[in-house]
């Protein structure tokens, strides 16, 4: 087994009830050694329970905790209640994966994005909850002996502009910059922004059907685009392997299609 995963590990994974988050939970669950813990969060309780059963089927020697949370209404107190029961002395690796996110209002072009309430709601889920949970995570697990690894699930749209997905582009770009700053300020942390490529998820389908921009809708549904679609299992397996190899600079971004 790889050195990275062959340790008692505590994993916190957001957006774990479906799609990439669910698959990632299962793939990581397969690798965790005995006495490890994986904490799953999402709004959908049924989805979380399904994920838990899928992990248990692969590995019954780890503890799995599920928390139904609304990241649109999150704060430090909520996250502190989740991490408070964890005995931080038990683990050699603490892994936080920020997977939860939303696409935003696809009916708004950039010139239409003028509603502070809509901006605040979007950024609460996609940025503020991320920075808040990260702060709580680092405060709780502050041992010098255990490694702390943070993965920010990102997207090509964090570095490339696309029409009608302004909220999503801004959210992903701001998250990436936050983690670059965090890595610069804390060089001992293991921080990675990982872009899984275009994976056929509910979010991708929503964008391809409901984007206000006709060109984007046609691009996402074109035959040419289909050759670039990544299977969710492949995207998750690559992340697991990247973490195991650890050949990246902390704070950097890696895309699924990178060589």
Can you say where each PLM-predicted feature lies in the sequence?
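Conserved NAD(P)H cofactor-binding loop of Rossmann-fold oxidoreductase domains
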Residues: 99-107
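Rossmann-fold cofactor-recognition segment
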Residues: 58-75
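Conserved glycine-rich cofactor-binding loop
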Residues: 17-18
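Amphipathic alpha-helical dimer-interface segment in Rossmann-like NAD(P)H-dependent oxidoreductases
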Residues: 124-146, 184
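Conserved glycine-rich Rossmann-like NAD(P)H-binding loop of the short-chain dehydrogenase/reductase
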Residues: 33-50
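Catalytic loop of short-chain dehydrogenase/reductase
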Residues: 142, 147-174, 179-184, 195-199, ...
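C-terminal helical subdomain
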Residues: 193-196, 211-259
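Catalytic Tyr-X3-Lys loop
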Residues: 102, 112-131, 175
């Amino acid at each position: 087994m790889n050195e990275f995963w062959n340790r008692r590990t505590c994993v916190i994974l957001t957006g774990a009830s479906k799609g990439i988050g669910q698959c990632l939970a299962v793939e990581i669950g397969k690798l965790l050694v005995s006495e490890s813990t994986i904490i799953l969060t999402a709004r959908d309780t049924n989805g979380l329970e399904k994920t838990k059963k899928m992990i248990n089927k692969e590995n019954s020697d780890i503890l799995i905790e599920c928390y139904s949370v609304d990241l649109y209404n999150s704060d430090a107190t909520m996250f502190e209640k989740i991490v408070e029961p964890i005995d931080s002395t038990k683990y050699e690796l603490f892994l936080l994966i920020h997977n939860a996110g939303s696409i935003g209002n696809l009916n708004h072009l950039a010139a239409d994005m003028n509603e502070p309430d809509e901006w605040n709601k979007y950024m609460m889920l996609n940025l503020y909850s991320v920075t808040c949970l990260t702060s709580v995570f680092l405060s709780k697990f502050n041992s010098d002996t255990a490694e702390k690894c943070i993965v920010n699930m990102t997207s090509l749209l964090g570095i490339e502009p696309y029409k009608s997905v302004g909220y999503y582009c801004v959210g992903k770009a701001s998250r990436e910059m936050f983690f670059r700053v965090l890595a610069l300020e804390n060089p001992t942390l293991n921080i990675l922004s990982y872009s899984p490529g275009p994976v056929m998820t509910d979010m991708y389908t929503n964008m391809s059907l409901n984007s206000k921009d006709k060109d984007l809708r046609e691009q996402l549904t074109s035959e040419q685009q289909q050759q670039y679609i990544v299977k969710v299992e492949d995207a998750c397996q690559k992340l697991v392997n990247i973490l195991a190899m650890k050949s990246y600079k902390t704070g950097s971004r890696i895309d699924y299609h990178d060589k």
